[in-house]
Swiss-Prot record:
Belongs to the RimM family. The PRC barrel domain binds ribosomal protein uS19. InterPro entries: PRC_barrel-like_sf (IPR011033), PRC_RimM (IPR056792), RimM (IPR011961), RimM_N (IPR002676), RimM_N_sf (IPR036976), Transl_B-barrel_sf (IPR009000). Disulfide bonds: none annotated. This is Ribosome maturation factor RimM. The lineage of its organism: Bacteria, Bacillati, Actinomycetota, Actinomycetes, Micrococcales. One of its GO terms (cellular component) is ribosome. Residues 181-217 are annotated as: Disordered. GO terms for biological process: ribosomal small subunit biogenesis; rRNA processing. The keyword Cytoplasm applies. It comes from Leifsonia xyli subsp. xyli (strain CTCB07). Binds ribosomal protein uS19.
Length: 217
């Protein structure tokens, strides 16, 4: 799984710099501040070296908001990566970091050219097309542990669209458009085909009593 090359929208990197999402802290491990990680990179030996500094994506209410985290050591326990970080010396501190997403600065000139990989600033502002008609525009990209979501502003409000090939089959940076093939109900309410209660056109069968139920006593 390659590094996710979609920096957070709030970060304004230099033209030759971007941020890569490389991991997520998932669970405190032991009593000395160690934390299990979920890796979003094929190169943990390059990204998670002693002294590596990560920008933290955490809620604004977190005491870690706006701070960085420096790695002391990465170990493997039963096939799972576990990180030890400066300033995180007990289980309480480790638990306060659970669900934090780790980002690193990256020189874009060192990134390999890769299809189907875009930066947030390339996607924000693109118009979203469905069946040849414009339905809205991308206003941000939300990065969740399971997948990324495109936040699309429409006349009816904001719609979150899973950024997967089946729903977003085409991104055309030159035309400043994305093509959508959303499932029913994503952009509109599904029709209610169920008959209304008391509708005489759909008679309701009387309730079945215990005596009428096969095997009832």
């Amino acid at each position: 799984m390659a590094d996710h090359k979609l920096p957070r929208k709030e970060v304004a990197p230099r033209p030759d710099q971007t941020e890569l999402r490389v991991g997520r802290l998932t669970k405190a491990h032991g009593l000395k501040g160690a934390i299990k990680l979920e890796l979003f990179t094929d190169e943990p030996g390059k990204r998670f070296v002693p002294g590596a500094v990560f920008t933290l994506q955490v809620p604004t209410a977190s005491k870690w908001h706006g701070k960085t985290l420096a790695l002391r050591e990465l170990r493997w326990y039963n096939g799972h990566p576990v990180g030890f970080f400066d300033g995180v010396d007990d289980r309480t501190e480790a638990e306060s970091l659970v669900k934090a997403i780790l980002w690193v600065n990256q020189d874009v000139r060192e990134l390999p050219d890769e299809e189907d990989a875009w930066y947030d600033n390339q996607l924000v502002g693109l118009s979203a097309h469905r069946d040849g008609a414009v339905v809205g525009a991308i206003v941000r990209v939300d990065h969740l542990p399971g997948q990324d979501l495109l936040a699309i502003k429409t006349p009816g409000g904001e719609v979150l669209v899973p950024f997967v090939k089946a729903i977003v089959p085409e991104v055309d940076l030159a035309a400043r458009t994305v093509t959508l093939t959303p499932p029913p109900g994503l952009f509109e309410d599904l029709p209610d085909d169920a008959p209304a209660a008391g509708d005489e056109s759909e008679p309701v069968s009387p309730p079945v009593t215990a005596e009428e139920t096969p095997g009832g006593e």
